[in-house]
Amino acid sequence: MYNTRRSAYMNSCSTAMELPPQSLHQNWQDTEYVNTTCSSDMNSDMSMYNDDKDDPFYEDEGSGGGTSGGGKKSSRKRANTTSSSGGNEKESKRTANKVCRVCGDKAFSYNFNVITCESCKAFFRRNANKEKEIRCPFNEQCEINMVSRRFCQRCRLTKCFAVGMKKEWIMSEEARLEKKQRVEENRERRLQDAMNRALEEACMEDESENSYDEAPAPSHQMSVRQYLANDDAPHKSSDEVQPHLGHHGYNQKEDKMMNFYQDGPSDQGDYSLPSNSCASSSQLDTSVNCGATTIADNGASPSNTVTIPAAVDVERKPIPTNVLFSASMSAIQDVAAIISNAETKNLGMCAPDVVNENLMNVAQAAVQAQAIVNHTQQLAAAVVAQQVVSNMAPVMPTVNPLDPLLAPAFIAPPMPTPINVPITTPIAGALSTPLPPPIVPPGHSSINPVIPIIPKEMPVSVSLLNQLEQTPAEMVTVPKDMLMKLIQKNSRSTCTCSCMCGRYPPGSCIVDEVTKDLLNGGSSNSSNATDRDETRLETTEDMQMNGLLPGDCNSSIQWLNQQSSAQAFVDPITHSMTAEEAQTQRERRDSIFGSFSAADQGTVTQPKSVQEETIWEHTVAENESRELSDEEIEKMEELTEISNQWISMRLDSMPILDLFSKKNVEKIVNGLKLLSSFRFLPQVDKRSVVKRGLFNYCVVKWMQHKESMSIDGLSDAARRDFMNIIRREEFNYRVQPGAFNTLAISVLFHSISDNLISTDVYMEHLVFKKLLDKNLPIKVSSDTVYNNYYPYIIKAAKHLEKATKGLSDELVAHAVS
């Protein structure tokens, strides 16, 4: 069919040209592409991947040996396949923000249960399960770092096991091969799915391109030419039909392709005009020309203008609107199809001026047909509106109101003047649907009826009473008589009486509380009233409403003072309950919120400080979220590792003064290097932290291990200060996991505001102070513990600094370096 339409179009051209058969299926650009690429396709090793860019291991360069079909020189060389070159986008996006626990190099994540670098991960996987014994070339005490890790395999492997790496987590050879096989299968499956999707998309594109040509014309639509031809068929004979474009024979019986489109030329049409004539060359006249459409397909059929014969009486035989509408829509679709399909590429070797002329003819015909449809619809709408107004006029009665003030509201609108202008364009198609007969009001036939009586709206209370009286049930959530009295005596003003007897919370509105009781369980006299009283004291809001807890508007101390002064008048608990019930409520409240009741306290003393006054609010604000973030979890793991190293080096069993020898100071500093917060500080800040905070750090470590670490060699005053530390209440918090480890690092980084080491050190101090808050028990603030404990720690550290005469700069520099 496509070839037939193509040949019909070529026959209509003034200069027909012979085209090869393959040109009917592809344009000259496609032919050129096939000719230029066939050689490269034939010489390709893999026809599916014949593009050099598809090979991830090779890339093109400007210089090379062979030449391609396009004349470009190219060569193939091995490309970089490391992750830094973008081979693995996931690895390149990762950031090595962790530190290897074995050598100190940068690491990505956990490997075999420990944060390690890629080098130590591979080393442990290769050597952990080896049966061959590895010997240390030195003294088996090698310090493993980024440089020395490749010198001693034994010490490196020993440290891997020491930090917690597990060889049980290494995959066996069978498991590794199985995992590799699964990866290969998944890769092949994804490749096959991608190829299937590509084939489906290609098929869908081909179907969408051919859908316009293969779509049959709707049976209920008719073109203008077909309508006129069918109407004029009895007046013409088949001999009078003129051949199309005289010098080319056109057999209408054999070839019906021109009737494929709904606005195509019919079998009995008039084609007397030249093929290059334009429908817009003559002025648009609705009494002569009803429409003109053209054929628009992939072959770009020529434009034709259809003229209605003079014998056709338009007023006697009007053209229906659906015919005009289908013709205009078809023409518009033809224009869109030609533009979207790039008709200039599908015309083969045709001249460009012929193509442009055809496009202009199609566009002008579409505009003309649309104008005819719009004009017809406007005239039809005007006639319909006139008839509707004339039919509705008798329905509106003329009213003579008794009150002159109401006259403007009831005056009937004036009768519209009928349209006497004759309509030249037929509107029979628009008025094909019969209009409904005019509505005649029943009964009153007089012209001036009385004013209609508008019934007054019944009050809501009356309607509710009528509904309740008709209800067969005796109970409607509440007794019917009670509800009826409430409705009858309903007042627009809201009752504001408050409860003073203790039945409801002090100051609460009785109406609101009774409404809540009715909604919850029916009558307030029901048997479950006691249960509701007990459940009202389960939440914080209920406690605050009943005066058992401080509200948002006052502090804890102010609330206690108010409760102590109000005890002489009414007790919200004991007034409405027995002694046993009141004690039960107090125990329930105290188990949830703590003992803060004024009834349990004899006298309320004034606070000692502002900090103790706001301890409740501060504690709730600080302990809202006790979840540890990922960064905080890593810091806690580092603190645990430092503590384990302190014990492994036997520093927990020696006198406290021996910790400040040169060898032990180096051990302590090496342990602190496991902490990323200390390791990433500048060298100058590290020395300042060690010189000023190491004594504070050792005091807290002595508090952790006071049973095994002695304080021999200190003066009596120093002993008393050390004993005062462990006698304080805060000393009991050392049983909390990680609490004193965090406190030790926090006092290590602490510096007074007048003499800050640096901003980085102070920020690290705040980080560990916040971490201390999450390690302490709930309702305990880190500010309270730190501010109450830190002066005693400083005082004990001064004794140590005085007894050891401080740390020399040479010792600190050697330990830190």
Curated annotation (Swiss-Prot):
Residues 52-62, 202-212 have a biased composition (Acidic residues). InterPro entries: Nuclear_hormone_rcpt_NR1, Znf_hrmn_rcpt, Znf_NHR/GATA. GO terms for cellular component: nucleus. Keywords: DNA-binding, Metal-binding, Nucleus, Receptor, Transcription, Transcription regulation, Zinc, Zinc-finger. GO terms for biological process: cell differentiation; intracellular receptor signaling pathway; negative regulation of transcription by RNA polymerase II; positive regulation of transcription by RNA polymerase II. Residues 63-72 have a biased composition (Gly residues). It is found in: Nucleus. A zinc finger (NR C4-type) spans 100-120, 136-155. Residues 273-284 have a biased composition (Polar residues). GO terms for molecular function: nuclear receptor activity; RNA polymerase II cis-regulatory region sequence-specific DNA binding; zinc ion binding. Residues 97-172 bind DNA. Its main location: nucleus. Residues 49-91, 202-221, 258-284 are annotated as: Disordered. Belongs to the nuclear hormone receptor family. PANTHER family: NUCLEAR HORMONE RECEPTOR, NUCLEAR HORMONE RECEPTOR FAMILY MEMBER NHR-48. Orphan nuclear receptor. This is Nuclear hormone receptor family member nhr-48.
